[in-house]
Amino acid sequence: MRIGIFSEAYLPLISGVVTSVVNLKEGLEALGHEVYVITPIPSKDKFENDPSVIRIPGWVIPRKSLKGFRLVLFVKRYVRKMRKLKLDVVHIHTEFSMGKLGLAVAKKERIPSVYTLHTSYQDYTHYVSKLLTRFAPNAAKKLAGKINNQYTKNCHMTIVPTKKIYDKMIRLKHDGEFTIIPSGINLKPFYKSSYTSEQVQALKDKLGIRNDEFVAILVARIAKEKSIGDLVEAFVEFYKSYPNSRFIIIGDGPDKPVLDKLIDSKKASKYINTLGFVKNAEVGLYYQIADVFLNASTTETQGLTYVEALAASLPIIVRYDDVFDAFVEDGKNGIFFNKNEELVKHLIHIRQNPEILGTLSKNAEISTKPYAKEVYAKSCETLYLDLIDKNNKKLNKK
């Protein structure tokens, strides 16, 4: 098959969507398919030329939260260029410029279109309109819902990563058909076996982490909806009982200055370290310096970094959300909490009982096998073939 993946974000940008697209592309290519990524040009000098990545010029978006992204205007003028690819199926991973182009290509070529819902915008109305979110939240949610619905309605199939999102789409009465396919991950870079003890020690030395320190880690976009402040508050309390501890926060985002200010106000910068952006190829090594993974977000559609942490044999201690029921077994490979004081108690408990930490760690890596990128690609391949077959039969009847 010749597959066109339309995405607003791609390498060198780093995000959950980019990770999903990269893994899908590599997985499908391993199955023998020809895969093209159609995406805006991120900048003039920060990407490698790849004939399978079609880059389209766009305008800088003057919003701090969308740094690195580009707005492509009048996308339909690029439809003719896409026709030269002779695509069999279109797979859309965005709701904006490239999504509109993907819909136009599928319609013009009369081929199936698939939409993966990465973000339910009704949980992120502050990105749609801060004014409406503040003064008319119901109107903001209604407007946000239309962003997703234009794709669920017009694509042949919408992929959602979890049953939670599937149920939500049905409950909110979004148009279209839905199927559940968890996004896949290239698990190998996160396995402990991928690194030598010398590599891990070198990173610890670089960060000033002693071997006897207990280390918690978070890898996330630094944004309001991630509730990272709750983790900071809890870790400060935990540190009072176990001062031989460290919390490493990896990631960047619009709320990083706010987070740094909070840490400074708690006089915690000595043991809570925000490292900012880390290259994607190096993230797997950073997981190896930690003992546990923490997260307090309840707005995840699938939680790819959670699976990465589990693949690195890290128990995850996370605020409960039913999206995590798919891969977290409370007390087996992770621990759920709801309130900050519960998180503090859990941290103290596993610090006092290292055998519990060992059991959780042992079970963590095993639980990630269903999320391998090979499984993800095979599931998408099966879906594409089914949609192509149905579409061909429909066209032959006309």
Swiss-Prot record:
Q: Topology relative to the membrane, per the entry?
A: Peripheral membrane protein
Q: Which Pfam families match?
A: Glyco_transf_4, Glycos_transf_1
What keywords sit in the KW lines? Carbohydrate metabolism, Cell membrane, Glycerol metabolism, Glycosyltransferase, Lipid biosynthesis, Lipid metabolism, Magnesium, Membrane, Transferase
Name the coiled-coil region(s).
none
Where it sits in the cell: the answer is:
Cell membrane
EC number(s) of the enzyme? 2.4.1.337
Q: How is its activity regulated?
A: Activated by the negatively charged lipids phosphatidylglycerol (PG), cardiolipin (CL), dodecylphosphate-rac-glycerol (PDG), 1,2-dioleoyl-phosphatidylglycerol (DOPG) and phosphatidylserine (PS).
Q: Name one GO biological process term.
A: glycerol metabolic process
Q: Which reaction does it catalyse?
A: a 1,2-diacyl-sn-glycerol + UDP-alpha-D-glucose = a 1,2-diacyl-3-O-(alpha-D-glucopyranosyl)-sn-glycerol + UDP + H(+)
Cofactor(s) annotated in UniProt:
Mg(2+)
| Molecular function as annotated in GO | 1,2-diacylglycerol 3-glucosyltransferase activity; hexosyltransferase activity; magnesium ion binding
GO CC annotation, single: plasma membrane
How would you classify this enzyme at the top EC level?
transferase
Quick one: where is this thing mainly located?
Answer: membrane
Family, per entry: Belongs to the glycosyltransferase group 1 family. Glycosyltransferase 4 subfamily.
Tell me more from the record: PG could also protect the enzyme from proteolytic digestion of the proteinase K, possibly by orienting a lysine-rich face toward the membrane.
Its annotated function is as follows:
Glucosyltransferase involved in the biosynthesis of the non-bilayer-prone membrane lipid alpha-monoglucosyldiacylglycerol. This is a major component for maintaining a certain anionic lipid surface charge density, for balancing the bilayer to non-bilayer phase equilibria and for keeping a constant lipid bilayer spontaneous curvature (curvature packing stress). Catalyzes the transfer of a glucosyl residue from UDP-Glc to diacylglycerol (DAG) acceptor to form the corresponding alpha-glucosyl-DAG (1,2-diacyl-3-O-(alpha-D-glucopyranosyl)-sn-glycerol).
Q: What is this protein called?
A: Alpha-monoglucosyldiacylglycerol synthase
UniProt gene name = mgs
